[in-house]
Amino acid sequence: MQYTVLIPLFIFIGAMVLFGFSFQKKQPQRRIVQILFLAYCVDFLALIIAVMMLTFLSYDDLMLGVLIPVLILSIIMFFVMIIAHYPLMKRLFGH
């Protein structure tokens, strides 16, 4: 039961891997946007699961040691994804 707290960590790592795929060369812009959207969704899923586990499960050192960094890194990664591909997003969505 105590290792269920690793689930958000692995989901977050999956979001980071997807974000890394968005930097591959010679990809069409549409493909980059699809990868980024999937990375946003996976990152948000890790954030939601971590918040739910912190809210509804009892606390121990492993849980706090894994879930709090996942929460912080997930929020930071959300903004990093926006900033890293800002020129592409600005060109696609205008303004």
From Swiss-Prot:
Coiled-coil blocks: none
Top-rank lineage group of the source organism: Bacteria
Main location: membrane
Keywords: Cell membrane, Membrane, Transmembrane, Transmembrane helix
Record localization: Cell membrane
GO cellular component term, pick one: plasma membrane
Transmembrane segments: 3-23, 35-55, 63-83
Membrane-related topology note: Multi-pass membrane protein
NCBIfam families noted in UniProt: MPN270 (NF045746)
Protein name listed in UniProt: Uncharacterized protein MG131 homolog
